[in-house]
Design a protein with these regions (language model features):
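Non-catalytic C-terminal interaction segments of nucleic acid-processing enzymes
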Residues: 178-212
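Metal-dependent nuclease catalytic cores that hydrolyze phosphodiester bonds in DNA/RNA
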Residues: 1-107, 200, 209-212
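Mg2+/Mn2+-dependent nuclease catalytic core
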Residues: 91-189
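A general marker of short, structured functional hotspots
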Residues: 11, 18, 26, 47, ...
């Protein structure tokens, strides 16, 4: 059985969608993720971590230092939406696809009243940015009680929301099948087998999670 996360699938999709000028860098980034290599935290990654942490603190009633008017307004808006929800909800489940058994795993930023919320801090936003993301198909598959998935997005100036409901997208099995076929066709399947096989640490992560 093999471990599979939306982060790995998203890294692969990012490579597939990259413009020619960025294809080499996107492939390098994906292979680094595939091979579980340590990565330095980039400025963009840290901005996302800090933004989510500020929302978590605000939801928990912990005061935060003001940053800027638009930033603080985004924090307040998203905190109101997430308030009363359950934070950091782990989800897991097994799937058999392309002749392989997978253990899917993820963590929802917030779950509230049947809605999964995921917080995104981006540099640039275009409508439909997450249309083909594997995150909402995977998480809605894993959390059967949720009816929809909403991305809460802040680009430094404005806030946005993208919502997806069941039936709006292809099942996660289709993405996994394409992913495995691509790995096979391009000679990377052994990297996946080597670095993503189930182990004790991963079993401990899913211990106690009600699987789909």
């Amino acid at each position: 059985m093999y471990w599979l996360t939306q982060s790995l699938l998203s890294s692969w999709k990012h490579f597939l969608d990259a413009d020619d000028a960025y294809a080499d860098a996107a492939l390098s980034s994906f292979l680094s993720t595939l091979r579980r290599e340590e990565k330095e935290t980039t400025q963009a990654m840290q901005a996302g971590i800090d933004f989510e942490a500020a929302i978590n603190s605000t939801v928990a009633g912990v005061p935060i230092e003001p940053v800027s008017e638009k930033y603080d307004q985004a924090i307040a808006k998203f905190s109101r939406i997430c308030s009363g929800g359950q934070p950091q909800v782990p989800v897991a489940g097994r799937l058999h696809v392309s002749g392989l058994d997978f253990q899917l795993y993820g963590v929802c930023d917030y779950v509230k009243a049947g809605v999964i919320y995921d917080i995104k801090r981006v540099q640039r936003y275009e409508y439909g940015k997450y249309l083909h993301s594997p995150q909402h198909p995977m998480y809605l598959h894993l959390l059967s009680g949720a009816s929809k998935f909403t991305y809460l997005i802040f680009d430094g100036a404005n806030t946005y929301a993208e919502t997806y409901r069941r039936g709006d997208f292809d099942p996660i099995e289709d993405t996994i099948s394409c992913f495995i076929n691509w790995l096979l066709a391009n000679g990377y399947i052994n990297d996946y087998f080597t670095h993503w096989e189930m182990n004790t640490e991963r079993m401990d992560k899913i211990d106690g999670i009600q699987s789909c």
